[in-house]
Amino acid sequence: MKALSKLKPEEGIWMVDAPKPEVGHNDLLIKIRKTAICGTDVHIYNWDEWSQNTIPVPMVVGHEYVGEVVGMGQEVRGFTIGDRVSGEGHITCGHCRNCRGGRTHLCRNTSGVGVNREGAFAEYLVIPAFNAFKIPDDISDDLASIFDPFGNAVHTALSFDLVGEDVLITGAGPIGIMAAAVCRHVGARHVVITDVNEYRLELAEKMGATRAVNVAKENLEDVMQELGMTEGFDVGLEMSGVPSAFHSMLDTMNHGGKIAMLGIPGGDMAIDWSKVIFKGLIIKGIYGREMFETWYKMASLIQSGLDISPIITHHYSIDEFQQGFDAMRSGQSGKVILNWD
């Protein structure tokens, strides 16, 4: 079968002919229709320090996808051949305290599809049936293929009450932009998103952000004054992993504010903890998606009228995968879809 693999410990991704994966007793065999390129895949392509310390070589990569069930193990229940599915990319152990307590997204033994085990950039993928999510008929393949990053946005955004609140999002990558759309959809008052990438800031405004702020050109506190804000942001969503962005968030949060952090800093990050203490801030780390509450919320948000389709800006056939990666690496894109049909 065709597959995209990290063949060598150097920059790049390569098309290979890989063996079709074998199906275990509790597994689904999924024929892939569409995949999306994640920022993680770009890290793997670039072969940065994180990738060098994490990714086994060679390995098929990718973890954002939609496909059709074409085979299943003898113990599988609840699925039928032909079901359209996406899937949770975090494979959990099922026996640690958090798994047994129903907090599977906090499994200490998590294995990532396309990160620690064979991924979805292939004609076929095998995952445990537990990890599969049936896609409702009224949700398109394009949207279903980005449920993984959309889930990161939903999990982060819905960590705290947003109704009538003022929200600051630092980092206008695709996940930050989708989070802005979620915040507006569920009733936030002002949603301000910051970055230095003009293309993505414009995309954020199309997706519903009240103000998209290029912090290289504008002062965030001036924008707050322009919006009539007098006490600071109630909720912060840190999506960038950039220390200066987080410092700006701490400066502009209201007392008693709440921060959800999804962005991963490149190294140790020093902050002024006195601001956290004296402002009484709550900081919550976010990893992945809640299984499977986030998935049901994703489907419900779309079915209730949330439109995230503008975040998908490029489509390529799988044979044009290099152009897809080039688009993602340029920063002049939203989500990039690779078609396998």
Curated annotation (Swiss-Prot):
User: Has UniProt tagged this entry with the keyword Repeat?
Assistant: no
Q: What does this protein do?
A: Catalyzes the NAD(+)-dependent oxidation of L-threonine to 2-amino-3-ketobutyrate.
Where on this chain does Zn(2+) 2 bind? 93, 96, 99, 107
Matches recorded under PANTHER family: L-THREONINE 3-DEHYDROGENASE
Record: residues binding Zn(2+) 1: 38, 63-64
Key words of the record: Cytoplasm, Metal-binding, NAD, Oxidoreductase, Zinc
Location of the protein in the cell? Cytoplasm
**EC number assigned by the record:** 1.1.1.103
For this record, an example GO cellular component is: cytoplasm
Q: What is this protein called?
A: L-threonine 3-dehydrogenase
State the free-text cofactor note. Answer: Binds 2 Zn(2+) ions per subunit.
